[in-house]
Amino acid sequence: MTIDNLAFEKALYDKGYTYICGVDEAGRGPLAGPVVAAAVIFEKGFYHEDINDSKTLSAKKRETLFELIKQHALAIGVSVVNHEVIDKINILEAARHAMEDAISKLKIKPQYALTDHMDIKGIPYTSIKHGDQLSISIAAASIIAKVTRDKLMVDYDEVYPQYGFKDHKGYGTRKHLEALNLYGVSPIHRKTFAPVAKLLKQ
């Protein structure tokens, strides 16, 4: 069964909305680095069959689509919320803040938002479970957020090469956990996340 990932947008166009943004984040799970959110508005009816949930795409494909989305989107907003804020307000609230901030950075004010399973303030919205698979706007936002965050983690890898951030992007892989135990906690690790918090208590 093929999924019509324009169905949510079409329903809103039929209700008279013109500017609909999809919003998603990347980086809720990692032990290090920021959470990044993106908001994307396409022209009414825009479709591209390859734009899908960023997690299902190869890094190379994501980067190709990142450029395509930048070319075709009417507006893109991106927000980066760092590890210190994540530790202060928790990852769920940090992700929510990043999504709301990404919307505020759009050069066109959206009339409605579609989010990937997140409640937000300041705009009428629909929270969609597995939204990055069901809405092209959310899928595009997931790609923008993921590619942006991955690039940031590659940059961090140059500052802290011993942790291998360019490979695992901060996720808790075996290699990352081994590096954590060997080298200790870096300045960009999330101190409230269990494996890091455990190390800090030792």
From Swiss-Prot:
Molecular function terms from GO: manganese ion binding; RNA binding; RNA-DNA hybrid ribonuclease activity
Reaction catalyzed: Endonucleolytic cleavage to 5'-phosphomonoester
Required cofactor names: Mn(2+); Mg(2+)
GO CC annotations on file: cytoplasm; ribonuclease H2 complex
EC number(s) from the headed UniProt entry: 3.1.26.4
Keyword Electron transport set for record: no
Residues annotated to bind a divalent metal cation: 24-25, 116
Free-text remark on how the cofactor is bound: Manganese or magnesium. Binds 1 divalent metal ion per monomer in the absence of substrate. May bind a second metal ion after substrate binding.
GO biological process, any: DNA replication, removal of RNA primer
Residue intervals of the RNase H type-2 domain: 18-202
Alphabetical UniProt keywords: Cytoplasm, Endonuclease, Hydrolase, Manganese, Metal-binding, Nuclease
Principal subcellular localization: cytoplasm
Pfam assignment, any one: RNase_HII
Location(s) in or outside the cell: Cytoplasm
Function: Endonuclease that specifically degrades the RNA of RNA-DNA hybrids.
UniProt family annotation: Belongs to the RNase HII family.
PANTHER family recorded: RIBONUCLEASE H2 SUBUNIT A, RIBONUCLEASE HII
Name under which the protein is recorded: Ribonuclease HII
Organism in which the protein naturally occurs: Acholeplasma laidlawii (strain PG-8A)
Gene name of this polypeptide: rnhB
